[in-house]
């Protein structure tokens, strides 16, 4: 019995000691925010020369993007939501540049953005071409005035920029490249500082040369020979990459401005990540998505170099957030979502 008393006493003493110890340790338990003195926390300073809230203007295209299934309104235009998502994935916001609004309104919106994107589509003449040409001219003027104002043009947008620079309406040639997944033949200039492909990881560049990671979806383009022998084009552009069509004919798939931050892509990176129509053959592999992201990162990194910092409220009043996207992909063709401007 005495032994039992001793054991009981020993047990309670041990338990009491443990409780005291636990209480003592509780005094030293900290939240993550309490681990450092606020004065001791420091972050690498951001580059004061860069604009970390860039805004991109995207030019709308005539129609509803769905052959009239979504809207037959006179003068309706659209932006495929995939272009908006592409820009946002790079860290920028979007202001729609409505192609048939007044020049005064367009100019006001251009004063709010740090770069422009020309989309794919079908319109090759009329008011749309006139507006695109005027915006392109103003973009070059912005650069001449000292602002770094990038332009990126996909598919039809790229072809129209080529036509505008060449000052020839018949400069383009027919190619069989509709809904064509493709690899790229990278030229030496692709390694140049400030080029699109310089932003790509080295392993992804290797994949681009062998795997079909980009989607071409056009019927016209320009051959390398024709671009190089046209003085206006060769003075303005250098070729970064070429591709072959279904007949084995080679066309320029990527080119960039020698003097200006202008990039022309005949392939459409936004479709890899954001378009799912069964009629397309867009690659959706992980590496194809990396191509989308790397292209977006490049373009928005260029836009951050723009010194234009407009009034924040004017920007907010013009953002595409003021509009709602419409689902147009129920038929499994065309764009999954579009923004309509009526």
Curated annotation (Swiss-Prot):
Residues 45-342 form the Gamma-glutamyl hydrolase domain. Keywords: Cell wall, Glycoprotein, Hydrolase, Secreted, Signal. Belongs to the peptidase C26 family. GO terms for cellular component: extracellular space; plant-type cell wall; vacuole. It is found in: Secreted, Extracellular space; Secreted, Cell wall. This is Gamma-glutamyl hydrolase. GO terms for molecular function: gamma-glutamyl-peptidase activity; omega peptidase activity. The keyword Chloroplast does not apply. The keyword Oxidoreductase does not apply. Its EC number is 3.4.19.9. Residues 1-21 form the signal peptide. SUPFAM superfamilies: Class I glutamine amidotransferase-like. Expressed only in young (1-15 day old) leaf, stem and root tissue. It comes from Glycine max. GO terms for biological process: tetrahydrofolylpolyglutamate metabolic process. It catalyses: (6S)-5,6,7,8-tetrahydrofolyl-(gamma-L-Glu)(n) + (n-1) H2O = (6S)-5,6,7,8-tetrahydrofolate + (n-1) L-glutamate. Glycans are attached at residue 72.
